[in-house]
Amino acid sequence: MLGWVITCHDDRAQEILDALEKKHGALLQCRAVNFWRGLSSNMLSRMMCDALHEADSGEGVIFLTDIAGAPPYRVASLLSHKHSRCEVISGVTLPLIEQMMACRETMTSSEFRERIVELGAPEVSSLWHQQQKNPPFVLKHNLYEY
């Protein structure tokens, strides 16, 4: 089963998790990380790293974030590069996350990414989709050769 780390501004992440658990019962491998004003990037990174390890069973983890480019999204992006089968999704809402509940058990992380972006477009995107639009910078020659 795919793990979920829901990370949003203020108390929104915990509110989403609480609403899901109220309706569906306790969710395994699902953690909420709230990003409050004044929280340092270092502390946010530590909290999200802990949540990643708690949610991961080896099948993959999906970071569900509220705003692309915001601190929770940026930290999730950095963490995803260090762990295989991690995806970063932005623009999520409670109804969309509810739609994806059953997919946690049947899809791979990349299949999940494609499906949630398809269902939530155009507001929902992923780190992978953003990277396809803006591929990383690659040097075509060695700068240090004389």
Curated annotation (Swiss-Prot):
<dbReference type="GO" id="GO:0009401">
    <property type="term" value="P:phosphoenolpyruvate-dependent sugar phosphotransferase system"/>
</dbReference>
<keyword id="KW-0813">Transport</keyword>
<dbReference type="InterPro" id="IPR033887">
    <property type="entry name" value="PTS_IIA_man"/>
</dbReference>
<dbReference type="GO" id="GO:1902495">
    <property type="term" value="C:transmembrane transporter complex"/>
</dbReference>
<feature type="domain" description="PTS EIIA type-4">
    <location>
        <begin position="1"/>
        <end position="124"/>
    </location>
</feature>
<keyword id="KW-0418">Kinase</keyword>
<protein>
    <recommendedName>
        <fullName>Putative phosphotransferase enzyme IIA component YadI</fullName>
    </recommendedName>
</protein>
<comment type="function">
    <text>The phosphoenolpyruvate-dependent sugar phosphotransferase system (sugar PTS), a major carbohydrate active -transport system, catalyzes the phosphorylation of incoming sugar substrates concomitantly with their translocation across the cell membrane.</text>
</comment>
<dbReference type="GO" id="GO:0005737">
    <property type="term" value="C:cytoplasm"/>
</dbReference>
<keyword id="KW-0762">Sugar transport</keyword>
<keyword id="KW-0963">Cytoplasm</keyword>
<dbReference type="InterPro" id="IPR036662">
    <property type="entry name" value="PTS_EIIA_man-typ_sf"/>
</dbReference>
<keyword id="KW-0598">Phosphotransferase system</keyword>
<keyword id="KW-0808">Transferase</keyword>
<dbReference type="GO" id="GO:0008982">
    <property type="term" value="F:protein-N(PI)-phosphohistidine-sugar phosphotransferase activity"/>
</dbReference>
<dbReference type="GO" id="GO:0016301">
    <property type="term" value="F:kinase activity"/>
</dbReference>
<dbReference type="InterPro" id="IPR051471">
    <property type="entry name" value="Bacterial_PTS_sugar_comp"/>
</dbReference>
<dbReference type="InterPro" id="IPR004701">
    <property type="entry name" value="PTS_EIIA_man-typ"/>
</dbReference>
<feature type="active site" description="Tele-phosphohistidine intermediate">
    <location>
        <position position="9"/>
    </location>
</feature>
<dbReference type="Pfam" id="PF03610">
    <property type="entry name" value="EIIA-man"/>
</dbReference>
